[in-house]
């Protein structure tokens, strides 16, 4: 997502350069994050790159070391003693969850459909067993069950990333506009643009505190891939991947559960948990659509989403999509 934002920012920079920055963004002192100019967008020091490589290898090394140690043996022995009971509890919970879905208005044959009361020949393979199933599949992407499960997994994954990314785009701008915390660059897409200009970001104004902040775009992309290999590999291996460390996850690949992935124990009540699944996918879909709006706003106005909202509320007749397209 970071790379896509950087590409978008480079396309929109020529347009945004003719717009003056909002006074609320310009007049504030930028004393929290230091920005310095580097020589190239591909600039990289071997010390920092080596540090990121070592840092990305720590999880693999730590897991392997613990699993092969006496501690790992003890953890696995303890897990084996409790696993039978845990599996039985998981089976009972899944049975109650199925009953909750049968009684819920969001699942099954009587669930809401995307055409509402209008008669429509909905795909027979969309049975309403998964959250957020409104019978919408005009392209027939879910005819094959394996493909359907894969796409559902992808949707959940992207929905969660979109919700997290939306917070990451909105919160810095809100803090900056309200004066809670001042950033050198609070607008999400301009951060990527600053990297394309070869700038170095030193977080909190502390010299040297930039992890990959002084690296070029290509090196940052490599770092992101390396740092994501571990979590993605564990997700690919399934929820059993943590059992060598004595961790049992009672759920499935989309909803692992357990203390590690559900520390607040939100899945304790099966009825509430099934409703939370629906709320999650609905809000995740809204977040993914919202990002399309963020991209469009950045390209057309050169501003962040919060500033665009402030402008629209202050003068809705002149600050809207139609007026923007007419100019």
Swiss-Prot record:
Expressed in a punctuate pattern in cotyledons and leaves. Expressed in flowers, mature siliques and mature embryos. The chain crosses the membrane at residues 161-181, 209-229, 286-306. GO terms for cellular component: chloroplast thylakoid membrane; photosystem I; photosystem II. Residues 1-64 form a transit peptide. The light-harvesting complex (LHC) functions as a light receptor, it captures and delivers excitation energy to photosystems with which it is closely associated. Probably functions in non-photochemical quenching (NPQ) to dissipate energy under conditions where the absorbed light exceeds the electron transfer capacities of the thylakoid complexes contributing to primary photochemistry. Induction: Induced by blue and far-red light treatments. Coiled coil: none annotated. Belongs to the light-harvesting chlorophyll a/b-binding (LHC) protein family. This is Chlorophyll a-b binding protein 7, chloroplastic. It holds the Pfam family Chloroa_b-bind. One of its GO terms (molecular function) is chlorophyll binding. Its main location: plastid. It is found in: Plastid, Chloroplast thylakoid membrane. One of its GO terms (biological process) is photosynthesis, light harvesting. Keywords: Chlorophyll, Chloroplast, Chromophore, Membrane, Photosynthesis, Photosystem I, Photosystem II, Plastid, Thylakoid, Transit peptide, Transmembrane, Transmembrane helix. It comes from the Eukaryota.
